[in-house]
Amino acid sequence: MQQFKKFLPWIILGIIALWGIAKYNGMVGKDQEVKRTWADVESDYQRRMDLIPNLVNTVKGYANFEQETLTKVVEARAKATSVNIDPSNLTPDKLAQFQQAQDGVSSALGRLMVVMEKYPDLKANQNFLDLQAQLEGTENRISVARKRFNEAVQIYNSAILGFPSNIVAMIGGFKEKGFFKSADGADKAPTVDFGK
């Protein structure tokens, strides 16, 4: 028994060390999941960015089309592609900056779709209809990717903020990550009618 008492502090220290290592490794896994889901978000936004030049070129073929609307779409795309975020540093501020740029693209595309209602020939163009369908599908993929990202961030943040795990997180340099938030006015459903 005397022998056991002599090793008891070492046993307790070993158990604490193993617990800390397990917690650290779990946090690394959750951090990697956040990075993976972020890559999915970026990939879907990139797909949307890749569709925009084709959409703009299709619309440009209609001489009377409002040039200002096309210019705003191109400018919003350029601004959004200039905002790059390091996935290991997804702070709430940087994520808000990224989201603001992407919301600018969404807004410009929304205005473009509204203006296109005035051009029945354009709405009958098969290339335009294909691009429109691809864009709608991409917007859905973006929505799903953002939801999965937010879920991964919630799991990660819960893992690093709870006590006593927060001690391991502090020692390991794990920091809280930001969520995607809904855009201003997102609580009101937009009116979209491509059938006219």
Specify the residue positions occupied by each region the protein language model found.
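A helix-centric hydrophobic-segment signal that preferentially recognizes long
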Residues: 1-196
